[in-house]
């Protein structure tokens, strides 16, 4: 089918972003931002954090100081590849070493004398072990010369015992916009955080809160716990900015609605009343008095001048090197937002908006942990020096303190799912889907306690700020993660920046701003504040804001600043601010540029002819004004057209209102949603369910399973899908396969395939259709003495063990077989016994229902014997296994039919799978039919006009009409078989065939939808879930089957199971199982007076309630279930009286029966 290049130019530009871009160092786009994030940490940021020189202790007015210096930081990559690490069963770590020097500085008249106290040159091979991120092709950032494995995308850490770990990205708690909160009616707070720039180490955090109560405007204060004074916000702004109150009034009132101006006047008047209430008021004296009061309150050891300098110098750490006057103007701009937000809350970004948040990526996790653990390490050294000086009178450090930085434990906890001790961020990759290597590292989630603290459920809704940057389909639809985890769209990524790049970029932007006329950037009274990462640098003339932003964006796209991901946001709506963002953790994605009402893509004439030979970075260099990288904040405050088609339908005046234009709808999906087909042609819930099922599909090998002992389920004969999307192809999901093509028929089969039941052909299974292999890890720890003990009596459980006590290779394990010898022995205290040694088997048994072959055995000998066994099992589809299409048509095997039982077409072809046809109508999955039609059309013409094999592009979300796809299928059949009549062609296009009854060999009355489709096998396997048993262990409390397959558990028999048996008329079975079972049977004595259950005291049944009242109760014995007795006892213990009352009936008397004469009639 010939492409309309003009209408698909936006689609082709979007595809250029998805494909690799070697010129820009991008070899795998989906996880590139994670690779860069981790690379920045281990190559640069780790050195910056660990390289320290600072005082530990100071004495004698700072003339004597104990100093610490950490230097010579070296990071060494491992000597082996990730595959070797898996074979050895070890982790894949880099080694970091450093040198610590502790010395004493004494200031003398001759200068500074230095005395060495202690030093340690870290050459220990286990000083700091940093889990190394495996990137695309098994590469790592420290050794890029490793061999390339094209289908290994990486993005994982190999933890100890060769377990792969993958983590999500967490939303940072600190917000870049202040948080507005209504405390109570007419009482509000405005909280914001200030964090020092990345070049300031250790990082300083300050959290401030501005409070405002309409009834007490004099108490409109700013405060911070133990780090700042509580002071009126207006007076603090006046103190810092050195302007009059009238200046502040005019600045707050400029371009504000009348209601806000009224509140501004009231706040300024309240500040005036404070100044007028103090005789000879002086702002400096006022602030100094508050600082002195705070100094006394905190009982600080510092002098008053040192205390004041620390408090005011460290005020607003993100503006650390900024003059106090700019800090004052910054506070005025915050107060403007606060007052405006009181009346117009809906126009201000709320705390759940992604505009306010940055994202923590892999590198940021390790950076945060390294920073925290280094501070703990230095704190331990300081405490040890103080203790030694106190106890011994010498400045010394124990070598144990110097050699235990604590980073190893922190990193190990991180990969075990703990970030900052309490917050879960990482989870083990379960190995059942290759796709999860992409989906998990590209997911963004909130802190688990973030929602609990805020006590808000709006965070669980699809927030408007997530539009275009997050996939609206791939979201959890049930469970605790609903609304808390979102998947990035295929065009979205997260920014990263080095400290040196940050400083250079900040310098270039400041130089550009200061290149403007001085008076135009000094409009601090009525201008638009310009901030760089929330730090105020200038205030722009309001008449120049549009020209400034337009020129800044053009220069950014042309590479003037050396960074194409700078975000510039023009905030209007009376808040009046220009925000420039350059930091890491911002969500960015490309957009098509609209300049002065023209789509720049249409203006560039040469772009269309040269596009095929260009990469995305080439387009950015040679056609810089076509595409712009836009962060989520800039997008939120910009006018963005939904699509190119809608933009071209607008008038010229309407076009001038827009700044950007979006790409087609398929680029708004994530990579998991891109594996689906035509979700916009289906009902809405099918997209969400389809994403969940696609992640549960069994795919091909994610790594060499024979060389690593880990769990996994893998497809044995995978096939590349024919109907794909561009994102599915560029992400290598298509090449790494997650299903097979099968022939399906939509029809009813003898009433067996009702609801979700499917019929599957027996010969299809025998030929390896959707066959899988299960790799399972079994791990046991055995005391060394138990492992060395010999068994006295031959046990059947040890029949698969060799003489060394380990299971044999290639042995087939069955349920009950031991995997290693574990014999516990005990000595009897009996002098007359001939043999006072007894032994018994305590080994862990193989518990799976199916036999498995032993593939590998690993043993580690320490104080215990650690045995790890890898078993393999081929598992063909059986009854109860689950399958699905890519349109969320999930089915369960209801019957395995022989080929002779299935209907066939004129060529003798029988369907591999029969699906109930009513499922299409009930679930409204039209795209499933389109997929079958397109796959069948491909089989008719698998090559394009140039003789090249070409898959069919059917994106997950597309704006193409169904008629277009029908026309494409029609052309394929006409090309391969031009002699077809119209009816035959229609049957071919719509996959309608006449099938024949296998019993009568007569054709069915109606045609059947019959064709190929890509089918997925899910990880929900019957034999993994079967826990039904007749006998076994029961819990002590409720006497129901215990839980867990490993503990031999079963399924509880409750009300729903009872209803099922009632439906089948099994009343006697219910009585036997629920009531008459020996284990559940319970004799209970009931008091007929009060209805209590009698207690048994010294073998005598008595009613406690009646005995205390000196009554003589009548106890009646009844038989009931143990569960009923436990329920009544538990309710009584909670203060709920459940009275068992007996049915009172009046006695019934029957009249005497009439006598019946049985004599023969002839004798009467």
UniProtKB/Swiss-Prot annotation:
It is found in: Virion. Keywords: DNA-directed RNA polymerase, Metal-binding, Nucleotidyltransferase, Transcription, Transferase, Virion. GO terms for cellular component: DNA-directed RNA polymerase complex; virion component. It catalyses: RNA(n) + a ribonucleoside 5'-triphosphate = RNA(n+1) + diphosphate. It is an enzyme of class 2 (transferase). Its EC number is 2.7.7.6. Belongs to the RNA polymerase beta chain family. Part of the DNA-dependent RNA polymerase which catalyzes the transcription of viral DNA into RNA using the four ribonucleoside triphosphates as substrates. Responsible for the transcription of early, intermediate and late genes. DNA-dependent RNA polymerase associates with the early transcription factor (ETF), itself composed of D6 and A7, thereby allowing the early genes transcription. Late transcription, and probably also intermediate transcription, require newly synthesized RNA polymerase. This is DNA-directed RNA polymerase 132 kDa polypeptide. It comes from Ectromelia virus (strain Moscow) (ECTV). The lineage of its organism: Viruses, Varidnaviria, Bamfordvirae, Nucleocytoviricota, Pokkesviricetes. The gene is RPO132.
């Amino acid at each position: 089918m010939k492409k309309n290049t003009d209408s698909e130019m936006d689609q082709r530009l979007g595809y250029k972003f998805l494909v690799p871009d070697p010129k820009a160092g991008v070899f795998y786009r989906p996880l590139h931002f994670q690779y860069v994030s981790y690379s920045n940490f281990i190559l640069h940021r780790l050195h910056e954090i660990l390289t320290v020189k600072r005082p530990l202790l100071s004495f004698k007015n700072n003339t004597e100081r104990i100093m610490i210096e950490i230097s010579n930081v070296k990071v060494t990559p491992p000597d082996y590849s990730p595959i070797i690490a898996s074979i050895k069963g070890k982790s894949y770590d880099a080694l970091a070493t450093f040198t610590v020097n502790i010395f004493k500085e004494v200031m003398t008249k001759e200068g500074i004398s230095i005395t060495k106290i202690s030093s340690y040159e870290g050459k220990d091979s286990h000083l700091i072990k940093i889990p190394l991120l495996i990137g695309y092709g098994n590469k790592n950032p420290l050794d890029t010369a490793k061999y390339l494995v094209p289908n290994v995308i990486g993005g994982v850490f190999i933890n100890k015992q060769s377990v792969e770990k993958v983590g999500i990205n967490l939303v940072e708690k600190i917000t870049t916009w202040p948080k507005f909160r209504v405390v109570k009616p007419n009482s509000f707070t405005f909280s914001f955080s200030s964090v020092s720039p990345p070049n300031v180490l250790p990082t300083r955090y300050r959290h401030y809160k501005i409070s405002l109560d309409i009834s007490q405007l004099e108490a409109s204060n700013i405060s911070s716990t133990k780090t700042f004074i509580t002071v009126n916000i207006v007076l603090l702004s006046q103190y810092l900015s050195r302007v009059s109150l009238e200046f502040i009034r005019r600045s707050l009132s400029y371009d504000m609605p009348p209601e806000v101006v009224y509140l501004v006047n009231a706040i300024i008047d309240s500040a005036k009343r404070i100044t007028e209430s103090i005789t000879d008021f002086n702002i400096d004296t006022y602030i100094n008095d508050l600082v002195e009061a705070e100094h006394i309150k905190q009982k600080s050891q510092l002098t008053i001048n040192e205390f004041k300098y620390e408090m005011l110098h460290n005020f607003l750490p993100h503006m650390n090197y900024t003059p106090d006057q700019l800090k004052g103007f910054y506070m005025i701009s915050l107060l403007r937002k606060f007052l405006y937000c009181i009346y117009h809350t809906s126009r201000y970004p709320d705390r759940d908006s992604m505009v306010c948040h940055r994202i923590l990526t892999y590198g940021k996790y390790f950076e945060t942990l390294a920073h925290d653990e280094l501070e703990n390490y230095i704190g331990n050294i300081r405490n040890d020096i103080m203790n030694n000086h106190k106890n011994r009178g010498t400045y010394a450090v124990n070598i144990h303190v110097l050699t235990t930085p604590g980073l190893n434990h922190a990193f190990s906890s991180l990969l075990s799912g703990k970030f900052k001790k309490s917050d879960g961020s990482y989870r083990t990759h379960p190995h059942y889907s290759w796709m999860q290597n992409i989906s998990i590292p590209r997911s963004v989630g909130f802190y688990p306690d973030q929602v609990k603290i805020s006590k808000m459920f709006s965070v669980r809704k699809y927030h408007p700020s997530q539009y275009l940057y997050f996939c609206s389909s791939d979201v959890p639809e049930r469970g605790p993660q609903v609304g808390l985890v979102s998947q990035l769209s295929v065009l979205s990524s997260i920014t990263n920046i080095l400290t040196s790049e940050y400083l250079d970029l900040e310098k270039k932007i400041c130089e550009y701003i200061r290149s403007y006329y001085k008076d135009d950037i000094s409009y601090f009274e009525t201008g638009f504040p310009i901030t760089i990462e929330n730090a105020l640098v200038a205030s722009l003339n309001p008449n120049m804001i549009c020209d400034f932003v337009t020129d800044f964006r053009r220069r950014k796209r042309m590479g003037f600043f050396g960074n194409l991901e700078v975000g510039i946001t023009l905030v209007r709506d009376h808040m009046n601010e220009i925000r420039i963002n350059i930091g890491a953790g911002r969500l960015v994605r490309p957009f098509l540029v609209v300049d002065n009402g023209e789509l720049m893509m249409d203006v560039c004439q040469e772009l269309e002819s040269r596009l095929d030979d260009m990469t995305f970075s080439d387009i950015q260099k040679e056609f810089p004004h076509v595409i712009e990288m836009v962060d989520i904040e800039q997008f939120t405050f910009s006018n963005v057209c939904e699509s190119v088609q809608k933009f071209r339908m607008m008038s010229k005046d309407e076009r001038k209102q827009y700044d950007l234009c979006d790409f087609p709808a398929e680029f708004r999906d994530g990579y998991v949603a891109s594996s689906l087909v035509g979700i916009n042609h289906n009902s809405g819930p099918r997209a969400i369910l389809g994403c969940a099922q696609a992640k549960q599909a069994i795919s091909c090998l994610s790594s060499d399973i024979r060389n690593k002992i880990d769990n996994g389920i893998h497809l044995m004969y995978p096939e590349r899908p024919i109907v794909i999307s561009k994102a599915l192809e560029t992400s290598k999901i298509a090449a790494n396969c997650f299903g097979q093509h099968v022939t399906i028929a939509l029809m009813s089969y003898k009433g067996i395939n009702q609801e979700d039941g499917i019929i599957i052909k027996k010969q299809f299974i025998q030929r390896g259709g959707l066959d899988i292999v299960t790799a399972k890890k079994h791990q046991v720890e055995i005391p060394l003495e138990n492992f060395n003990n010999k068994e006295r009596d031959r046990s059947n459980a040890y029949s698969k063990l060799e003489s060394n006590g380990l299971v044999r290779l290639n042995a087939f394990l069955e349920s009950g077989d031991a995997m290693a010898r574990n014999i516990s022995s005990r000595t009897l205290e009996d002098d007359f016994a001939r043999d006072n040694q007894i032994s018994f088997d305590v080994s862990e048994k193989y518990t799976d229902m199916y036999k498995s072959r032993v593939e590998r055995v690993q043993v580690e000998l320490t104080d215990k014997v650690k045995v790890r066994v890898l078993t393999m099992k081929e598992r063909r589809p059986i009854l109860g296994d689950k399958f699905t299409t890519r349109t969320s048509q999930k089915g369960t095997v209801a019957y395995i039919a022989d080929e002779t039982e299935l209907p066939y077409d004129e060529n003798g072809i029988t369907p591999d799978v029969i699906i109930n046809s009513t499922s299409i109508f009930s679930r409204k999955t039209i795209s499933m039919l389109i997929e079958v039609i397109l796959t069948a059309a491909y089989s008719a013409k698998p090559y394009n006009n140039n003789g090249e094999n070409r898959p069919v592009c059917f994106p997950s979300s597309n704006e193409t009409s169904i008629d277009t796809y029908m026309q494409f299928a029609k052309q394929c059949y006409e090309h391969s078989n031009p002699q077809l009549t119209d009816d035959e062609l229609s049957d071919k296009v719509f996959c309608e065939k006449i099938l024949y009854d296998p019993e009568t060999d007569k054709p069915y009355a109606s045609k059947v939808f019959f064709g190929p489709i890509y089918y997925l096998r899910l990880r929900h396997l019957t034999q993994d879930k079967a826990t039904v048993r007749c006998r076994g262990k029961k819990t002590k409390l409720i006497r129901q089957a215990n839980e867990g397959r490993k503990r031999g558990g079963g399924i509880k028999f409750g009300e729903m199971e009872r209803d099922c048996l009632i439906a089948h008329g099994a009343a006697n079975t219910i009585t036997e199982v629920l009531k008459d079972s020996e284990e559940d049977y319970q004799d209970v004595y009931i008091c007929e007076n009060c209805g209590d259950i009698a207690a048994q005291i010294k073998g005598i049944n008595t009613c406690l309630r009646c005995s205390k009242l000196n009554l003589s109760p009548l106890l009646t014995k009844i038989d009931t279930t143990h569960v009923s007795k436990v329920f009544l006892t538990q309710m009584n213990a909670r203060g709920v009286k459940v009275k068992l009352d007996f049915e009172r009936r009046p006695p019934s008397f029957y009249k005497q029966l009439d006598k019946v004469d049985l004599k023969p009639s002839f004798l009467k």
